[in-house]
Amino acid sequence: MQRLVAWDAACLPIQPPAFKSMEVANFYYEADCLAALNKLHPRAAGGRSMTELTVGDHERAIDFSPYLDPLAASQQPAQPPPPAAAAGGNFEPACSSGGQDFLSDLFAEDYKGSGGGKKPDYTYISLTRHGHPCGSQSHKPGVLPGCFPPQIVETKVEPVFETLDSCKGPRKEEGGAGPGPGGMSSPYGSTVRSYLGYQSVPSGSSGNLSTSSSSSPPGTPNPSESSKSAAGAGGYSGPPAGKNKPKKCVDKHSDEYKLRRERNNIAVRKSRDKAKMRNLETQHKVLELTAENERLQKKVEQLSRELSTLRNLFKQLPEPLLASSPRC
């Protein structure tokens, strides 16, 4: 673990009067294991010499002032690279000129070949995973068996290509035996196969990376499955077998057929007779109800006439007679 040392005015580099520094890289990290040295050598209250403020082996700092102000950088002498960069621990390329771009100067050392300007072969991590040595660079001390330098493994390789190749690589190597595009016997065969797995997804496999960890690689469909599908498709072409039962052949001149027909006719006659009897009963009841209705209507008319007669009689009586009569 590392802890951040507090800002110190003496730690800031000396800049020209007309220069305004915009860098924020003056953070110096100090290891916890060197904390005892601070107790043995306490810091002075005032300013310290420049020899005490130099960057140690356990520290690193990048000066961005040449990129921010090229005119001020041209006036200052070029500083030697820190010892950590010479040892190969940290990648800190020195500025070649003040007017160059920061990114171009940063990646200048990355693309320089160690063997005479030849660009390294950027292959996938599947080569190192399966251990396919490269014929041209397999015996070089500074190159890994995967045909690319160690800094490429850390920075240039994308870990997305590991899952599909690790699952599908051994099964593909067993199937591919011949040279050329079909066999893939070259040391880059597994790389091409792992890359094609992400470019074109064959039928029967999913293109999603979350489901690409299946143990079996996609291949030709099983003949048993194709036959089952063909049989299933053929079953829907025709009607079900239950509807194709042949009718039982009966001889119309046989005694059994005649007896059956006679029983059927008797049952039909009985049902018809019952229906006729119900119809007759319903008609008879309708006639009875109609006669009762007529009788009641005649009685209502008779009572209405009697009521009208009584009203006329009461109207003809004199008023003193009606007043002397007792009221019920």
UniProtKB/Swiss-Prot annotation:
Region (Basic motif): 258-278
Tissue: Specifically expressed in myelomoncytic cells.
A Pfam family reported for this protein in Swiss-Prot or TrEMBL: bZIP_2
Residues recorded with modification N6-methylated lysine: K39
GO biological process, any: positive regulation of osteoblast differentiation
UniProt keyword annotations, A-Z: Activator, DNA-binding, Methylation, Nucleus, Phosphoprotein, Transcription, Transcription regulation
Record's compositionally biased regions (Low complexity): 200-231
Post-translational modification: Methylated. Methylation at Arg-3 by CARM1 and at Lys-39 by EHMT2, inhibit transactivation activity. Methylation is probably inhibited by phosphorylation at Thr-220.
Residues carrying Asymmetric dimethylarginine: R3
UniProt effect for mutating R3A: Not methylated. Increases interaction with SMARCA2 and MED23
Domain bZIP, chain residue ranges per copy: 254-317
CDD domains given in the database record: bZIP_CEBPB
Effect listed in the UniProt record for changing K39A: Decreases methylation. Increases transactivation activity inhibition
Gene Ontology molecular function, alphabetical: chromatin DNA binding; cis-regulatory region sequence-specific DNA binding; DNA-binding transcription activator activity, RNA polymerase II-specific; DNA-binding transcription factor activity, RNA polymerase II-specific; histone acetyltransferase binding; histone deacetylase binding; identical protein binding; kinase binding
The protein's name: CCAAT/enhancer-binding protein beta
Gene source species: Gallus gallus
Lineage: Eukaryota, Metazoa, Chordata, Craniata, Vertebrata
